[in-house]
Amino acid sequence: LIQDQEINWRVSPEIRGSKSLKYKNESISISVIGARESYLSIQGYEIDQGAFFTERDDLARKRVAIIGSSVGTELKTSSKALVGEEVDLGGVTFKIIGVTKSEGSSGWSNPDEQIYIPLLTASDRVFGRDRVDSIRVEVPNTYTPEEAMISIERVLRREHDIGPGEENNFRINDWSQFTDLQKQATAIFSALLIGIAGISLMVGGIGVMNIMLVSVTERTREIGLRKALGA
């Protein structure tokens, strides 16, 4: 796909999984992403400290890693303090060479709580498999999402040797659709919170009004008696 003349776009194959991450006496379960050097720019992530791994690191299967901004906190330290330190990832020693800037949760995953390693390192040293889970593609603005998906499907069908009329053995997702859905869900959730807050205020107001009415009613005889006595 990378070398294909029809689609010369920036791509990053990915291998994903969960492994234990240990540093000194602390241990956590963490989401591991094995990817290419282009993954960072495709995702729009930035390095806060240190550097991202290079293509040379990938080809050499180097045991280097980049961590999200919250990983250090989970290990009872700070992510920046881990730069230059060695950690145990699934029984394999890695050197932390960088930390990403905080991105926040996307609803499906949280980049701040992940660890990123070179694709071939992940394949050979961590997961022991050469089958990728997904391929992330950065589509130029000159293409519409529909045009891009048609072109990608055509290339993948050819590479997978899928004949005419045969079903695809892969799935193509337009991430912008998920982004739109997330925005809609966030808007609905915000509206629900505002609605719940409004109901709470209304119920609270009724409660205060009832208390005031009860207080006045209970003191009616007392007030009448005081007036009769000239108070």
Where are these predicted regions, by residue range?
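Short acidic amphipathic segments
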Residues: 7-11, 165, 230
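Short amphipathic alpha-helical segments
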Residues: 28, 131-135, 168
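Mid-to-C-terminal secondary-structure elements
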Residues: 33, 37-53, 61-163
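Intracellular coupling helices
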Residues: 197, 206-231
